[in-house]
Amino acid sequence: MQRFEILDKDAMGRICRIETPHGRIETPTILPVINPNIPFIRAEEMKKFGAQAVITNSYIIYRSMREEALEKGVHGILETDMPVMTDSGSYQLMVYGDVEIKNAEIVEFQRHIGSDIIVPLDIPTPPDADYATAESDLRITLEREREAKELLKGAENLLAVPVQGSTHPDLRRFAAGEARKIGGDIYPIGAVVPLMDAYRFRDLARVILEVRSALPVEPIHLFGCGHPMLFAMAVALGCDLFDSAAYALYAKDDRYLTVYGTKKLSELNYFPCKCPVCSNHDPEELRRMEKNERERLIAEHNLYVSFQEIETIKQAIKENSLFELVEKRVRAHPNMLAGWRQVKHYWELLEKADPKMKRKFLYTGIDSLYRPAVRRHVKAIKNVELPEEVLVSTDFGIYANIYLRPVFGPVPAEMLETYPAGHAEIPEEDVVEEEALKAASEALMELMNSHPEKRFKVYVSKVWMKHLQNLPPNGELNVLS
């Protein structure tokens, strides 16, 4: 049985299928956390929000209901037929510093209770740990993962192989490479919740990109990511699965999730949402409710908005408009924008993943300059045949060999109807950002330098002049009246 299949791609995001013993999971998706002792919302109820699978803590089950779990199985105690992923107690290890169980015991326990996706007892090294500590923890984690692989030989359960390494890029990349050698079914990126809590999205993006560099195809799970404002960026960077108890934890503090951030119920006069909760109640009604009822409804909203964002992301992947969606979402917070801009340092990775042909290019701001389509265009035009004298113009109403467009730069006349430059929607040159004009001007000068034997006569409107003052010697600059 093929356990993993990629159906659609855009940027580094994908729509995939993962086959488990209890059915198929289509990604990207979220696995809501279910507390086996006190289920805030029951596992089966999660289906109405869009859940295809859930995650629970096998260590808690082992400590509090071991015999019942061995008798009924994890699906029996959660009363669901959905796929169930079980964590191993690593969270407790991170919070309390110790757990009273060995790796082999918890892996075997997860297998015996019928977990669909098993997680070994990895060591979640926190951000900013010194290199020696992170490396030592990683060695132990890798040994435990190898042990788990041996223990699960011949089993139908899927194995998750967590990738650790703290905030050290080389360790994360090394860990991902070693995890790939071990051979898991899913690769969770661990110990990143402190980065998300502190809004350290630049560091988060680097961690994801380093892991994706060593795992170019495999399914990646971003452990503990449960805020909808992060999903689009994380998917575009290469993540497929998310899990979180955020829907419940935020609700307990009267915090209301949106794709642009978190709102306090006390500050809301209107709900910016039309989910069943928000359609049938207003903020004042919720504030007057008993705490338990209010928490439940806010948690339901938090789940609805989270799964709605997943559907929005999937549709964007289908339409090849994921870049446009991400460029909107990252403006929710300056630190998210800084995180997204880390893709500039991983050009080759992004170019390999992103589809070469799409229906259109919609410019949303200067971050559109970083898309692979722009870089590919600038490379491609260097191979276009040019006459001895090349006429370049910013006026599309007159004849020219090459037209100069913001963002893309030189566009040969024969490419005016082709993707990307010919299918691009870009603001007029007098209102577009200066960076878009500068990038286009640099692309033109790069083309001129690559053809020193050709003569370029360049006719541009005034807005371009300051960016083209230093044309190469084979260029003649003229201003259009």
From Swiss-Prot:
Annotated substrate binding sites: 122, 191
Biological processes, Gene Ontology terms: tRNA wobble guanine modification
Keywords: Glycosyltransferase, Metal-binding, Transferase, tRNA processing, Zinc
Record note on cofactor: Binds 1 zinc ion per subunit.
InterPro entries: ArchSynthase1/Queuine_TRR (IPR050076), TGT-like_sf (IPR036511), TgtA (IPR004804), tRNA_ribo_trans-like (IPR002616)
Pathway, per record: tRNA modification; archaeosine-tRNA biosynthesis
One term of GO molecular function: pentosyltransferase activity
Cofactor: Zn(2+)
Superkingdom of source: Archaea
Active site: 87 (nucleophile)
Chain residues that bind Zn(2+): 273, 275, 278
Known catalytic reactions: guanosine(15) in tRNA + 7-cyano-7-deazaguanine = 7-cyano-7-carbaguanosine(15) in tRNA + guanine
Cellular component annotations (GO), alphabetically ordered: cytoplasm
Keyword Transmembrane helix annotated: no
Record's function text: Exchanges the guanine residue with 7-cyano-7-deazaguanine (preQ0) at position 15 in the dihydrouridine loop (D-loop) of archaeal tRNAs.
Name this protein carries in UniProt: tRNA-guanine(15) transglycosylase
Species in which this protein is naturally found: Archaeoglobus fulgidus (strain ATCC 49558 / DSM 4304 / JCM 9628 / NBRC 100126 / VC-16)
Gene transcribed to yield this protein: tgtA
